[in-house]
Amino acid sequence: MNNPAYSLTMRDRLAELAPYVGNTPLYPIKKLFPSQKVKLFAKVEWQQFGGSVKARPAYRILRKAVENGSLDGGKAILDATSGNTGIAYAIFCAVAGIPLTLCIPENASKERKHILRSLGAKLEFTSPFEGTDGAQERARELALNKPHLYHYTDQYSNDNNWLAHYHTTAPEIWEQTGGKITHFVAGLGTTGTFTGTGSRLIEYNSGIELIALQPESAMHGLEGWKHLETARTPAIFNASLPDRVELVDSSASYEIIRDAAKYEGLFLSPSAAANLLGAIKVAEKLDEGTVVTVFADNADKYGDVMQEIFSNN
C-alpha cells in the first residue's frame, strides 16, 4: 500500500530547496581573453546548493520521481555517476530522507568518495577501466535483480536531465547576456547540459551557434566527459544539435588551470578548464560576438590532481 504521508514529506522538503538550485552567476573572462569586441562568459555552476552543474538535473529528476510515486514503498534512488550528479543526489536525498545507492568507477577521487559516504550514500564501485559505462551496467543489474528495492533514475537516458537545463540554464544565460549570446560552448558527458541549454537557446535565436566539446582521445582524464567515438552515447543526446564538435587537449586543459587561478581568481576543475580552453579557441576565431560556456564545478574535489598541478609553481 502506498504511503502518501511519506511521499508528501519528501515532496515538501524538496520543494523548499527550489530557490537554492540554479540562478548561478555569469562570470566574465577578461584576463585570459582580453577583447573589446568578443565577450567571453562562464556560468559558475558550483555556486548553488548541490555544488555543481549536476544539481540542476539531479534536483529535477528527484522531484519528478517523488511526484510520480516512483519511490513509494521506500524504494531507494539508484544511478550511475562519475561523482558530481551523485553528490547532488546525496545532498538532496539527505534533506528529503531518501535512501540512495550509487554505482561509481573505483578511480573516482577520494574527495568524492568521502563526500558521498559522509552524506549517507551507499556506494557500489565498478572497474576504473570501464568508466561510467561500467557503472551504468552495474546499475542496470541491480535494478533488474532487485526492482522492489530500487528506482533506477538513469541520468544518461532520463529526459529530466536535459529538461533541467532547458528550463533553467538557458533562460538564465539569455537573460544574463541581455539576449546577446552568439555562441554556446560545452563539453559532452551525459550531454544534458549541452542538449538542454542548446535546444532552448536556438528557440530564442536560431542564429546562435552551438559548439560541442569532447576530449581528443578515449584516455583523457577529464572526469565526467565522454569520448563518444569509444563510449556509449547517452540516449538523451541529439547528435543533430551541434553546429560542430571541437576536440580539446587534456594536457592543455590541465595547464590552463594554473592560469585561471593566477589571473582570473578561479580554482577550476579539469572539466571546467577544458570548457574554458574550448571556449577561448572558439572566441579567438571571431571578429565580434558573445561566447558562453559552463564551469561545471571547481577544484575542491580534486586534491591529488591539484597538488600535482600546483606543486611545480
What are these regions (language model features)?
Residues 1-313:
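PLP-dependent amino-acid enzyme catalytic core
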